[in-house]
From Swiss-Prot:
It comes from Corynebacterium diphtheriae (strain ATCC 700971 / NCTC 13129 / Biotype gravis). Pfam families: Anticodon_1, DUF5915, tRNA-synt_1. A motif ('HIGH' region) lies at residues 58-68. GO terms for biological process: isoleucyl-tRNA aminoacylation. This is Isoleucine--tRNA ligase. It catalyses: tRNA(Ile) + L-isoleucine + ATP = L-isoleucyl-tRNA(Ile) + AMP + diphosphate. A motif ('KMSKS' region) lies at residues 627-631.
Amino acid sequence: MSDAVGGVYPRVDMSGGTNVFPDMERQVLEYWKDDETFKASLTNREENPEYVFYDGPPFANGLPHYGHLLTGYVKDIVPRYQTMKGKLVNRVFGWDCHGLPAELEAEKQLGIKDKGEIEAMGLESFNNYCAKSVLEYTQEWKDYVTRQARWVDFDNGYKTMDMDFMESVMWAFKTLYDKGLIYQGFRVLPYSWAEHTPLSNQETRLDDSYKMRQDPTLTVTFPITGVKDDSAADASLVGAYALAWTTTPWTLPSNLALAVNPQVNYVEVKVGDQGAEAIRGQRVLLAEALVGAYAKELGEDHEVLTVRPGSELVGLTYQPIFSYFADHENAFQILAAEYVTTEDGTGIVHQAPAFGEDDMNTCKEYGIEVVIPVDMDGKFTSLVPEYQGQLVFDANKSIIADLKAAGRVVRHQTIEHSYPHSWRSGEPLIYMALPSWFVEVTKIRDRMVELNKEIDWMPSHIRDGQFGKWLEGARDWNISRNRYWGSPIPVWVSDDENYPRVDVYGSLEELERDFGVRPESLHRPHIDELTRPNPDDPTGKSTMRRVPEVLDCWFESGSMPFAQKHYPFENKDWFDTHSPADFIVEYSGQTRGWFYTLHVLATALFDRPAFKKVVAHGIVLGDDGTKMSKSRRNYPDVNEVFNRDGSDAMRWFLMSSPILRGGNLIVTEQGIREGVRQALLPMWNAYSFLQLYSSKPAQWSVDSSDVLDRYILAKLHDVVAAVGDALDNTDIARACDEVRTFCDALTNWYVRRSRDRFWAGDTEHPEAFYTLYTVLETLTRVTAPLLPMVSEVIWRGLTGERSVHLADFPQADQFPADDDLVRAMDEVRGVCSATSSVRKAHKLRNRLPLPKVTVALPESARLADFADIIRDEVNVKEVALTSDVDSVGRFDVVVNAKVAGPRLCKDVQRAIKAVKSGNYERRGDTVVADGIELVAGEFTERLVAADPDSTTQIDGVDGLVVLDMTLTEELEAEGWAADVIRGLQDARKASGFEVSDRIEVKLVVPEEKKEWALRHTDMIAGEVLATSFEVVTGEPAEHDIVAGVTATVQKV
């Protein structure tokens, strides 16, 4: 063994003298800051091809959370990797500033309860406060992003409230308007009464928008009074009651019609004596298919009088349920509407056109004008005086009571259903007819679907599934908000309808041209103050005034690719070469949010996708499997994790999980610590091992002839190729899997099996040191994007150079590939692992030698060259190889009927029968039974062994090991000696000796063990570097070695 070891590494010490990862990370972060390493990574590549990454802007009026942490790690890994592959990757950070989130937070801080208080405060004061509060937590965000080792450019970032950004948004609106893709319409929209603004359909599909809610449902009567003059309806139905069902009783005061499906059969039923009081003995009309659903209300003795299609009910008139709009033109008749179904209710649908899109469209066909007795606060107006001033949901109780008193209620129930709520305030929405501005998405919908085919999605099923289906059903996008803090809708209209005119502006220059002043702010109220005489008014009395709405903040975030660079007013060439982006990432809910608005605007403005590749990850959940909640404290504090385990551990935990393939992830402290065990510790331990035994700097070499060196270098070839391929395809979880597997081979096999060569030293075995150095130097370049800080510490410690993040990602062809060796050695590892599992099951310690292990697998001869390794690793005297697997056991196939049944249906029983009779064969990863293919998961394999207690399967191959566990006195003595060696090594360590120190040993043993000690003196002394070794009996010595054995150890 070499006398001089250690002291060569680290070439540069970034550990700060500690092996605590969070402490190392702080050293690395400080170094990067002082060295300006991120800036150098950009400067080094500035002449290279660019990899374009768009960073979705967060709001800075709240603190970041695990969702931001997860997305941020991906946003760091991909650019780091692409940089190491030779690309220039700019990472500009932006801030989302406008919209409801900002206003609501400002209202909360100011104690404002409604819009009236904002207007009393003054728009300028309110918006100034919003501008300040929206950036309240920017420093916390910067600290957080920096601590997670994410490299971003804060200095050249953008804010959506900047004048340049807002001007680009104006340009986008004007361009869409000129293309005929923007219009003002009056439509039923999801409306937030709490925030006084309509929302877009996609906003009602965002996370947390739908919540479970209990609401009353009513079935009420509408007495038939006559027949319209132009109708063929049967007058004999006059006096019958049409039954209609609703889940929104508050809309009944606005009822103007009923609707039936002309293709559905309806019945006239005579209600029995046991029927509901409101209809007892009366004739009622409802869908034939729903009679059973109303059996109780109709009474057991009810009688079906007539059956007729819905088309023969159209044109019947009825008595209004309330008299508020009794004289409304064309109202209170039964209409035809094919959307009416018999899935629930009565098959007759009450129509309140102000509060239902289908209702509005149907009533419009019949010339029924909309009436809206609800104000912007969601409260009834003077049009319905009995309920005036009541919030519509609160009015349900009074309305139901009044209808019951009038004898109009047939059934009153309560249902719990999923109902849309405001994604920001959390209050339930209502659907109400409102004037709004729309992007006519339906005009470009087909093109959006086509362009989506060009996008590479991770997970792939989202393209044609969640996102593709949404695109296929995309509706016109409501982009106006009746709010204050946002980009203005750049439309000016005449204030005199006798002289109509509409002007739309797309630049500051256009505004200056018409208004004679260049705006210093595009925010309200300044932009509202721009007025001018109407050029189309010869009287000169009318004025052009801006419409009061502001833009949906999602329009701004969708404009980010071009607005961040003030396109098209500046950087036109830049944008033309930076769109579409090579890569974006957010959570999967953004298929209704940012991904969608990016796609809409890119299609409408540029006729191309906004991005080429996108990762849509799943949701981070608390440790109880539910949404993270501060009140429930169901997740570990992020800063505590950073301080205890480190950011690299958190990064590994999140990035190696199924969440990046669209699944959800439960965050637990144990899971985070597992990241340390799986990747950080194996790398660090291998590096520490090299540090410990190196007496001189190692060289980068791939030329060793030693079989273990050849194996680990071939594995290195494979992991470089596999991780590169995974990261090329943004499959970060697979990259982590590959690294984890390699680290296991490196530390639990290569280093451990090579210990004797390292103990002998780098003069006697330089190839071992060269190989481990080469592996670690390469591995840290592979892991640099995945584990940026520990990789930096190890790589700089090995090389002394500036930063691993300024190095190139390795090329697989730099290393010798050897598929046959890797396959064979991996099988050897499998054999050893299987053998150890049998030992463990029988509680036979590894230091106890056993007589024999039989390895049975096809083509077993290929392991003959490795028999000595197996023998030494599993501590047996003999290794027997056989290809006759059937002589020691077999594998029976068992069909998993629960899994296979849904796909195979009746054929599953045929497959089960065939497998039981042996009529099947293995074909790769499948089983074919009587011609029926069973895929992975639809079957399992069960080992049937000749000697079950001593036999187990070799993982990953169709092979078995059989361990002979017969013990002899000789084997037990040798095992005891090995235990003594371990105990003496522990005594050396406890005494503070260096690994190369020679020692003197006096071993005190029981009389019955003295002969065993003397028999194995040479072996024990050699292993513990004892120049003097004495075996005695008598009084116990200083160090406990094994049961009944003590020792004195002294340094020579």
